[in-house]
């Protein structure tokens, strides 16, 4: 009987991808990034091994929210004090801190365990055009071709 070859962490070659988020829907961007971070686009994907690549997202402030998500989608967090429930709409978060909006969206699509946290750390989001990862020679990736 043959066994499926499982990927080992030492054998995985990681690439760096650069994604421009200008006029891209938040959901489409997040699903594509989560797929790359998990490594599901690779033939040697193994669920219990971090096989994903590094992703750099630029122009997060130019994202597009479709429908009524700018007003109706609410993000909650609590200060741990009584009555400390805070809420902010997706439109307000996009205007104030677009990096946080992308991070929350992608983090919700990754596993809720230590492997998911390890995969999340390979994502680098920037609100503007500039980023500090030129030394890694990232490969430009078009989101429209992935989905």
UniProtKB/Swiss-Prot annotation:
GO biological process: negative regulation of translation; translation
A GO-annotated cellular component: cytosolic large ribosomal subunit
Keyword Repeat part of the UniProt annotation: no
Similarity comment: Belongs to the universal ribosomal protein uL13 family.
Assembly with partners or alone: Part of the 50S ribosomal subunit.
Protein's job: This protein is one of the early assembly proteins of the 50S ribosomal subunit, although it is not seen to bind rRNA by itself. It is important during the early stages of 50S assembly.
Protein name: Large ribosomal subunit protein uL13
Species of provenance: Lactobacillus delbrueckii subsp. bulgaricus (strain ATCC 11842 / DSM 20081 / BCRC 10696 / JCM 1002 / NBRC 13953 / NCIMB 11778 / NCTC 12712 / WDCM 00102 / Lb 14)
Gene that this sequence comes from: rplM
């Amino acid at each position: 009987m043959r066994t499926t070859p499982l990927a080992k962490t030492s054998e995985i070659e990681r690439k760096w991808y650069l994604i421009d988020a200008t006029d891209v829907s938040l959901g489409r961007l997040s699903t594509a990034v989560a797929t790359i971070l998990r490594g599901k686009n690779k033939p040697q994907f193994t669920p219990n091994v971090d096989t994903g690549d590094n992703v750099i997202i630029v122009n997060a402030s130019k994202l597009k929210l479709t429908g009524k998500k700018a007003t109706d989608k609410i993000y909650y967090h609590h200060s741990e004090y009584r009555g400390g429930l805070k809420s902010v709409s997706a439109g307000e978060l996009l205007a104030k801190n677009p990096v946080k909006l992308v991070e929350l969206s992608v983090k919700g699509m990754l596993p809720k365990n230590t492997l998911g946290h390890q995969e999340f750390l390979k994502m680098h989001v920037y609100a503007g055009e500039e980023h500090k990862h030129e030394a890694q020679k990232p490969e430009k990736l078009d989101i429209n071709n992935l989905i």
